């Protein structure tokens, strides 16, 4: 492990790389151009709901793509429950050279449905996918 000096403090090369990437910000127009590109087919999954074939990308794959195109992005949620339905409002913030920019979306799930996962994580995943689409990521799948 190599030790280097940064602002009078000794840190490892791994810590230096972390600082470099944490402070890295791209121009917003470049980020948005990349996010609007169609997602590669290897990330796209398929499921059938009520007889219709649906194309989708898992939230964790979208998370990886966001890490690649918009390093340092932030995801914040607020949840509510009315007794039968969970609602999540998610805010996806991109850190660009020009500043921080946020777009929000909602996700919801009935609490009594027998679905994979739990209502809260399903609603959050839906809000995240929708927030990504508001930035252009995966938007071509919604049409």
Enumerate the predicted regions with their spans:
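N-terminal, Lys/Arg- and Ser/Thr-rich interaction peptides
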Residues: 1-54
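Positively charged, aromatic-enriched nucleic acid-contacting surfaces
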Residues: 50, 57-143
């Amino acid at each position: 492990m190599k030790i280097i000096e940064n602002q009078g403090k000794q840190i490892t090369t791994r810590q230096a790389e972390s600082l470099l990437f944490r402070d890295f910000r791209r121009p917003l127009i470049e980020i948005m151009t990349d996010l609007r590109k169609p997602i590669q087919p290897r990330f796209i999954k398929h499921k059938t709901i009520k007889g219709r074939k649906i194309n989708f990308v898992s939230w964790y794959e979208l998370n990886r793509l966001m890490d690649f195109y918009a390093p340092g992005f932030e995801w914040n949620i607020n949840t509510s429950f009315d007794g039968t339905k969970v609602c999540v409002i998610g805010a996806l913030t991109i850190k660009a050279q020009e500043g921080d920019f946020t777009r929000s979306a909602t996700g919801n799930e009935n609490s009594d449905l027998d679905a994979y996962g739990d209502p809260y994580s399903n609603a959050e995943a839906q809000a995240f996918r929708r927030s990504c689409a508001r930035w252009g990521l995966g938007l071509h799948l919604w049409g």
